[in-house]
Amino acid sequence: MRRKMGDARELDRSNLVYHEAQDRMALLPNYYAWIARRFQDSVRGTVLELGCGAGMVLEHYLPRCEKVVAVDVNPELLRTLAARFGGGKVDARRADLRGDWSELADVRADVAVALDVVEHFEDDDSFVEKLKARLAPGGTAVIKVPAQSRLYGAMDKASGHWRRYDADSLRALFERHGFSTRALRPMNPVGAWGYRLKKDRDTNYSKTFSPAKLKLVNAAIPVLALFDHLPGLDGLSLVGIFDLKA
C-alpha cells in the first residue's frame, strides 16, 4: 500500500511537470509543425498516438489519417484535446502507459506515434513490445527521442528521462522486437549545441526559456529546420520510422 501511494504521488508530480511543460511549449507551434513534417508522409489509416498531450502535433497529421486514438495520462490535457478535435475522428483515452495497456486492448493501429515518450520508461523493451501488440500486421512505429547519449545529465533526470539514444541503440531496440528500420535521422542540430551548455542544470529544458525567448525560437524555427538537411551533424533528437515485419 505504501508503495502504491508513493507511485500515485510521483505520478501526480510528474503530471504537474508535464502539464506545465505543455503550457510553455504551446508557444512553439512552428516546432510541432516541424516534427510532423518529419513523419507525416508515413501516416495512414488508424493512428495510435501515445503520450499525445494536448494534440499539438496531432493537429498537423490529422487530415492524413482516418482516425486517431489519442492516449495520455493527464486528464486535463485530454479534455483540452477533446475540445479541440470534435467530429468523432479523435478518440481520446486516458491510460497510464506504465501499466498493462488494458485500456487499449481493442486497438489495432496502422501507425503508432510516440514522440518524446520512450525515454521515460526504464524498461524500454517492454514499452516497445506493448506498442507492437497494438499494431496491425505490417504496421509502422514513428518514434522521436532525445539524441546523443553523451549529453545525458541532470536536465534529463529532472525531465524524467532514463536515457538518451544514439542511432545504433534506437535501431537495435526496435529491430530486436521484429521491426525493420525505414528511416532514422537526426533533428535540430542547432538545439543540440544549446542543450550542451545547459545539460547539467537540475530543471526541465523548457523552463530555461522565458516566454519571450520561446517566441523568438518559434520565429527562428524555419531557419533552424534547414540544418536538418546538412550531413554529419548530430541532432538534439532522433526521429525513426520502423516497420513491423510481416
Residue ranges and their predicted role:
Residues 1-107, 111-115, 125-128, 206-210, ...:
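Conserved N-terminal segment of class I S-adenosyl-L-methionine
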Residues 116-120:
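A short His-aromatic
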Residues 126-140:
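A short glycine-rich, Lys/Arg-flanked "PGG" loop and its adjoining helix->strand segment in the class I
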Residues 141-163, 169-172:
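Short, glycine-/aromatic-enriched active-site segment of Class I SAM-dependent methyltransferases
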Residues 179-189:
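Conserved S-adenosyl-L-methionine
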Residues 188-203:
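Active-site-adjacent helix/loop segment of glycosyltransferases
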